[in-house]
C-alpha cells in the first residue's frame, strides 16, 4: 500500500510539472516572436530613414553647368567636380572668340571671366550661379562635404592657402606668362619682376610642403587651386628641380585620375588658338571698362 501511495504521488508531480514546462516553452516562443517582430520593425525604420536621407535618382542626375575653358583657373573647378564625382555638363567659354562677353554669360559671371557654375540643386532646392574660382571651390566643398573640412582649425588652414593662391600665385604666375610669352615686345624689367616673384612663391610652397604631403595637411581645394599653375612652371621661367618638396607634391597630384581628367577637357581645341591674331589679343589683353 505504501509503495502504491508513493507511485501515485510521483505521477501527480509529473502531471503538475508538464503544464509548467509547456507554459515556459510557450512563453519562450512568444518572446522569440516578439524579438523577431521588433527586429523587423527596426530594420524597416532604418530603411525608411536611409531612403529619406538619399536624394532621388532624378535629383542626383541633375548636372551642374560648368562654364569653362582650359586654363589654370578653369582646371580648378573641373578637377573638383571630377574628384567629387558630381554630374556636370561642360559649357565651353572660348575666351579667344569672345564668348565671355555674351549677355547670357555675363548674367552668370558679371566680371566676364570664367570659370562659373550654375547648380540647379542649390540652397533650398533652387538654382544658384557662382562665379570666381575660389568661391566656386568653397561652394562645392560645402555642398559635398569633401576637400573642405568643417573643423574650424582645419578649414582655416585650407582657406589660408586658397586665398594665398587667389591673391598671389595666380596673379603673379599669370603676369609671368604674359610678359614671357604673350607681350608684343620684351620688357626685361617686367619679365624679371614676375619671374622672380613666382620663384619666391614656389619657395614658400616648397618650405610648406617639407613636412606635409599637402598644403593644408590633407588633400583639399587649396591643392586643386594651385596645381594648374605649378604644372606650367616652365612657362614661368622656373626649374621645378630647384624645389624638391614642391616637385613631389606636383607629381603626386598629377598622378591622381581626377586631376588628369579635369585637366584634359578641351585642351586640344584651346591649343589651336592663334595667340598672334590681333583680334584674339584684343579680346584677351586690351579690354577696357564697358558702359551698361
Residue ranges and their predicted role:
Residues 153, 165-262:
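GST-like fold's C-terminal all-alpha helical module
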Residues 3-5, 11-15, 48-192, 196, ...:
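GST-like domain detector, emphasizing the conserved glutathione-binding G-site
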Residues 2, 6-45, 49-51, 56:
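Low-complexity, polybasic segments enriched for Lys interleaved with small residues
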Residues 80, 141, 229-230, 263:
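Active-site-flanking alpha-helical
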Residues 267-292:
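Acidic/histidine-enriched, glycine/proline-rich intrinsically disordered or flexible terminal extensions
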Residues 122, 229, 267:
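Flexible loop residues that form catalytic
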Residues 94, 221, 266-267:
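Short, solvent-exposed turn/loop segments enriched in Gly/Ser/Thr/Pro and often Arg
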Residues 98-99, 251, 270-272:
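Short secondary-structure boundary/hinge segments and terminal tails
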Amino acid at each position: 500500500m505504501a509503495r502504491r501511495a508513493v507511485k501515485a504521488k510521483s505521477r501527480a508531480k509529473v502531471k503538475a510539472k508538464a503544464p509548467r514546462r509547456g507554459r515556459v516553452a510557450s512563453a519562450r516562443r512568444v518572446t522569440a516572436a516578439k524579438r523577431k517582430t521588433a527586429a523587423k520593425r527596426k530594420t524597416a525604420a532604418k530603411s525608411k530613414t536611409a531612403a529619406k536621407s538619399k536624394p532621388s535618382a532624378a535629383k542626383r542626375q541633375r548636372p551642374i553647368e560648368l562654364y569653362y575653358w582650359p586654363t589654370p583657373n578653369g582646371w580648378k573647378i573641373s578637377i573638383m567636380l571630377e574628384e567629387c564625382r558630381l554630374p556636370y555638363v561642360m559649357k565651353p567659354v572660348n575666351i579667344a572668340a569672345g564668348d565671355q562677353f555674351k549677355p547670357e554669360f555675363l548674367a552668370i559671371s558679371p566680371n566676364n571671366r570664367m570659370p562659373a557654375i550654375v547648380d540647379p540643386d542649390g540652397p533650398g532646392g533652387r538654382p544658384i550661379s557662382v562665379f570666381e574660382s575660389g568661391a566656386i571651390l568653397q561652394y562645392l566643398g560645402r555642398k559635398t562635404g569633401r576637400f573642405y573640412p568643417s573643423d574650424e582649425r582645419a578649414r582655416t588652414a585650407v582657406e589660408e592657402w586658397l586665398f594665398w593662391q587667389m591673391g598671389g600665385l595666380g596673379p603673379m604666375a599669370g603676369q609671368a606668362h604674359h610678359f614671357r610669352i604673350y607681350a608684343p615686345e620684351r620688357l626685361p624689367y617686367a619679365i624679371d619682376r614676375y619671374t622672380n616673384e613666382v620663384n619666391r612663391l614656389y619657395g614658400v610652397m616648397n618650405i610648406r610642403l617639407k613636412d606635409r604631403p599637402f598644403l593644408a595637411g590633407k588633400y583639399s581645394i587649396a591643392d586643386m587651386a594651385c596645381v594648374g599653375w605649378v604644372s606650367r612652371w616652365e612657362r614661368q621661367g622656373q626649374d621645378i628641380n630647384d624645389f624638391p618638396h614642391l616637385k613631389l607634391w606636383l607629381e603626386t597630384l598629377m598622378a591622381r585620375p581626377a586631376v588628369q581628367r579635369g585637366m584634359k577637357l578641351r585642351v586640344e581645341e584651346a591649343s589651336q588658338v592663334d595667340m598672334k591674331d590681333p583680334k584674339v589679343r584684343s579680346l584677351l589683353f586690351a579690354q577696357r571698362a564697358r558702359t551698361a
